[in-house]
Amino acid sequence: MGKGNAKNSGGGDKKSKAKAGDAKDDSKGKMKGAQSVNVRHILCEKFSKKEEALEKIRNGAKFDEVAREYSEDKARQGGSLGWKSKGELELPFEEVAFSLEQSTTGNPKIGEAKTGYGYHIIMVEGRK
């Protein structure tokens, strides 16, 4: 598990350029104070495969369907990792996951991270 790079990018028409670690304190409380997230991811060992998956999502494919096709981990569950608390995930992944806004598989707000496992495309379905 080496150093990783983290970056966020939005899916669909809305692009999220939030930096890992940014905390947004708006009236809905979406970003600040979450201690756990319900997270999905697509894991690809190869950068080129990750880019193909990203392209499908950006062209309107549902996140869970792309996960079943491209992910090398948790593909049968549509990429679902379930609820994860702070400290349970590798730091680059965690920083992105906790900085993302909640979204749906049909209109995901996605982020990217690189860990020792490979390249991750990440989305968050819930926060608490």
Swiss-Prot record:
PANTHER family: PTHR45995. GO terms for biological process: rRNA processing. PPIases accelerate the folding of proteins. It catalyzes the cis-trans isomerization of proline imidic peptide bonds in oligopeptides. It comes from the Eukaryota. It catalyses: [protein]-peptidylproline (omega=180) = [protein]-peptidylproline (omega=0). Keywords: Isomerase, Rotamase. The keyword Disulfide bond does not apply. Its EC number is 5.2.1.8. Belongs to the PpiC/parvulin rotamase family. PIN4 subfamily. Residues 1-35 are annotated as: Disordered. One of its GO terms (molecular function) is DNA binding. Residues 34-126 form the PpiC domain. One of its GO terms (cellular component) is nucleus. Residues 12-29 have a biased composition (Basic and acidic residues). It holds the Pfam family Rotamase_3. This is Peptidyl-prolyl cis-trans isomerase pin4.
